[in-house]
Regions:
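Compositionally biased low-complexity segments, especially N-terminal hydrophobic helices
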Residues: 2-7
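Alpha-helical scaffold segments
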Residues: 8-158
Length: 158
């Protein structure tokens, strides 16, 4: 098996890796490959082998998912930080429990406070401002594991 990985500078200045496989395709684990943001080209060429729930959580798969909306797992997509536009267009399919933990969904959550799962939001590192405005709804156990919540925890230490 020959695996070649090239580094690509992503638009957001994050390093992304594009995976080129020269391998017997019967040896590929399509479940895990469907989760790999660097494998989108290979997955696009082998749509029949995609694990759609796994792909729905793949941040690199938004274009492919947009072309196959009928195959999306909406629970998994609701946790995908790059899927906010797709979720907004399919508002009635959002899983709000999963979305509450999604760091990319803060604006959507702020606009729909009545739908928030406060335990999952308490774990969301991007939700500190929203949590600060709703201290009475915080799940303090979950917040304790939130790496962005140290200031909020210390300010509310009993």
């Amino acid at each position: 098996m020959l695996v070649v990985i090239t580094t690509i500078l992503h638009l957001e200045r994050k390093q992304m890796y594009k995976l080129y496989l020269i391998v017997d395709k019967s040896k590929i684990n399509w479940y895990w490959l469907s989760d790999n943001p660097g494998a989108i080209d290979l997955l696009t060429e082998n749509v029949d082998k995609i694990d759609w729930p796994k792909l729905s959580g793949n941040p690199g798969a938004i274009d492919l998912l947009s072309k196959n909306v009928d195959k999306i797992n909406w629970w998994m997509l609701s946790g995908n930080p790059n899927a906010i536009d797709l979720l907004t267009k399919n508002f009635n399919k959002i899983n709000w429990v999963e979305l509450s933990a999604n760091p990319g969904a803060i604006n959507l959550l702020t606009e729909n406070v009545d739908k928030i799962n406060w335990s999952n939001l308490s774990c969301n590192p991007s939700a500190i401002d929203l949590l600060t405005k709703n201290v009475d709804k915080i799940d303090w156990d979950c917040l304790s594991g939130n790496p962005s919540a140290i200031d909020l925890l210390t300010k509310n230490f009993d």
